[in-house]
Amino acid sequence: MKNIYVVLSSTPTMMGKIIRVFTRSFYNHSSISLTENLNEMYSFARYRASNPLVGGFVKEFPERFTLGKQEDVCIKVFSIPVTEEQYETIKLFIYKMKQDREENIYNSLAALGVLLGYKFDTYKAYTCSDFVVRTLIEGNVLWDACLSKNIIPDEIHMLLEKYATYSGFLNAYKPITGVNYDAEDFFEKSGAVNEVAYTLYHFYRLIKRNIVYSFYIASKLSQINKIFTV
């Protein structure tokens, strides 16, 4: 048997605080790790500290949670026992995401949908919680119905409560000692003009995918109707 680790966090960022207020939740971010020391922890989040709206598949590290500030973060860790086959399936799913990181982007529309009570399904676009739950579904830990609506970290908490192994501050989580990471890209500043351009392009990609996906679904429904009306 092996273990997969899910980490929920209550980050001190402005975006994190807004999400917690609107969702009335304690946690605002979800991550998944292949190792207990969180050396292989992944999620969908911002690419750079300076822009919370543009993101995608990322490998996470402690300083991402606080944007480099000297603050601690409340986390909850769930240690989920899985078979060797489940572990490899989950690992392969994550690594495929990593290889296709240019196409897999953060679903900022879905994040807004959580706040507005509307679900945006977008091709190859995920929120942090979408990604964690989809990964667990791939490994047959959770079931498809878990994604029938917008899912938030506190709902993941309810689904995985029996696997909880740690609740407290990130800095006090002992297994994290000695983890190596490169934070240079995350804290790189590209300037206000570039950030605006990145944001506009990011939302253009999301909206375009939503329009294309809507036409695709409409086409499929039309084909099904023709079959049943013949």
Regions found by a protein language model. Give the residues of each.
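Cysteine-nucleophile amide-bond enzymes
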Residues: 1-230
